[in-house]
Amino acid sequence: MATRTQARGAVVELLYAFESGNEEIKKIASSMLEEKKIKNNQLAFALSLFNGVLERINEIDALIEPHLKDWDFKRLGSMEKAILRLGAYEIGFTPTQNPIIINECIELGKLYAEPNTPKFLNAILDSLSKKLAQKPLN
């Protein structure tokens, strides 16, 4: 049985494919997750994350951008965007504790992105979580 960490990794892969221009991924997300042995509760969890990000993608991007400082969101790599979007969605719209989300995103950055990416992800998501702690979305 897959773990939540594995489910998040699979969601990042789906978001990466979507960001890379594969809009068909929305239609086949469930079957792709099942191919990765993401089933039952973890499948529902992964699909809720994937669909949640896509439903609120513009809002999520707007949440991330002020925390980028000297970076332009459009110039970020697709994998960095995928991980940041997942993290920002979970921080803003799910009950999962922020330190868990940030740690998971750092680990995903180590697995999928460039060597400096985990520090970058940590800085952005930590800043976002502190802002939302002061002024929650809901």
UniProtKB/Swiss-Prot annotation:
GO biological process: DNA-templated transcription termination; transcription antitermination
GO MF annotations, alphabetized: RNA binding
The keyword Lipoprotein appears for this protein: no
Keywords associated with the record: RNA-binding, Transcription, Transcription antitermination, Transcription regulation
UniProt keyword annotation of Transcription regulation present: yes
Matches recorded under Pfam families: NusB (PF01029)
InterPro entries reported in the protein's UniProt record: NusB-like_sf (IPR035926), NusB_fam (IPR011605), NusB_RsmB_TIM44 (IPR006027)
SUPFAM superfamilies for this protein: NusB-like
SS bonds (residue pairs): none
GO cellular component: cytosol
Sequence similarity: Belongs to the NusB family.
Function text: Involved in transcription antitermination. Required for transcription of ribosomal RNA (rRNA) genes. Binds specifically to the boxA antiterminator sequence of the ribosomal RNA (rrn) operons.
The protein, known as: Transcription antitermination protein NusB
Organism: Helicobacter pylori (strain G27)
Lineage of producing organism: Bacteria, Pseudomonadati, Campylobacterota, Epsilonproteobacteria, Campylobacterales
Gene that this polypeptide is encoded by: nusB
